[in-house]
């Protein structure tokens, strides 16, 4: 497990290259698909269930790539990108705890969208609480999460599932 409890954008980019937690650790996506600018807090025993929590942020500005294509005259951040960020953070948590392999989103129990991220927004905040960690032949994390834009909760997800696989050829 890493001793660090916060991470910069440079750290997150290093994670995408296999240079943060080691070459066999789960990687974050690179470039445009990395939907996180910083991890403010990560721990293994906090959160609602006492199994870990993560708080992370994404800075919003009108020049972000998705505003140009979703939609041409009605720019809004695609909801799937916020959901993907939540899966990214569950995988990041497992890598931070020392898991090795390739991360894959395995599903989500429930997702609710009650707002939107527009180009004039300033900041998205993700808050995840780990519900369950499985470290057997299958490594898996299950979490609940919320996403806020400028302090207002607009997405919630229950039972986000991410697995870490040493072999994905038959996946």
UniProtKB/Swiss-Prot annotation:
Keywords: Cytoplasm, Fatty acid biosynthesis, Fatty acid metabolism, Isomerase, Lipid biosynthesis, Lipid metabolism, Lyase. This is 3-hydroxydecanoyl-[acyl-carrier-protein] dehydratase. Necessary for the introduction of cis unsaturation into fatty acids. Catalyzes the dehydration of (3R)-3-hydroxydecanoyl-ACP to E-(2)-decenoyl-ACP and then its isomerization to Z-(3)-decenoyl-ACP. Can catalyze the dehydratase reaction for beta-hydroxyacyl-ACPs with saturated chain lengths up to 16:0, being most active on intermediate chain length. It comes from Shewanella pealeana (strain ATCC 700345 / ANG-SQ1). One of its GO terms (biological process) is unsaturated fatty acid biosynthetic process. One of its GO terms (cellular component) is cytoplasm. HAMAP family: FabA. It is found in: Cytoplasm. Pfam families: FabA. CDD domains: FabA (cd01287). Disulfide bonds: none annotated. Pathway: Lipid metabolism; fatty acid biosynthesis. GO terms for molecular function: (3R)-hydroxyacyl-[acyl-carrier-protein] dehydratase activity; trans-2-decenoyl-acyl-carrier-protein isomerase activity. The active site is at residue 70. Belongs to the thioester dehydratase family. FabA subfamily. It catalyses: a (3R)-hydroxyacyl-[ACP] = a (2E)-enoyl-[ACP] + H2O; (3R)-hydroxydecanoyl-[ACP] = (2E)-decenoyl-[ACP] + H2O; (2E)-decenoyl-[ACP] = (3Z)-decenoyl-[ACP]. Homodimer. The keyword Lipid metabolism applies. Its EC number is 4.2.1.59, 5.3.3.14.
């Amino acid at each position: 497990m890493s001793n660090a409890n916060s991470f910069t954008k440079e750290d997150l980019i290093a994670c995408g290259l296999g240079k943060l937690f080691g070459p066999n650790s789960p990687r974050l996506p690179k470039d445009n698909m990395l939907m996180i600018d910083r991890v403010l807090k990560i721990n293994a025993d906090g959160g609602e269930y006492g199994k870990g929590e993560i708080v992370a942020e994404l800075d919003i500005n009108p020049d972000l790539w998705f505003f140009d294509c979703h939609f041409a005259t009605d720019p809004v951040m695609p909801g799937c990108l916020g959901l993907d960020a939540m899966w990214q953070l569950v995988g990041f948590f497992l890598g931070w705890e020392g898991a090795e392999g390739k991360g894959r989103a395995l599903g989500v129990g429930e997702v609710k969208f009650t707002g939107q991220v527009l180009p004039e927004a300033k900041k998205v905040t993700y808050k995840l609480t780990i519900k369950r960690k499985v470290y057997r032949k299958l490594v898996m994390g299950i979490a609940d999460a919320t996403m806020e834009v400028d302090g207002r909760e607009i997405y919630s997800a229950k039972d986000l599932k991410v697995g870490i696989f040493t072999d994905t050829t038959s996946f």
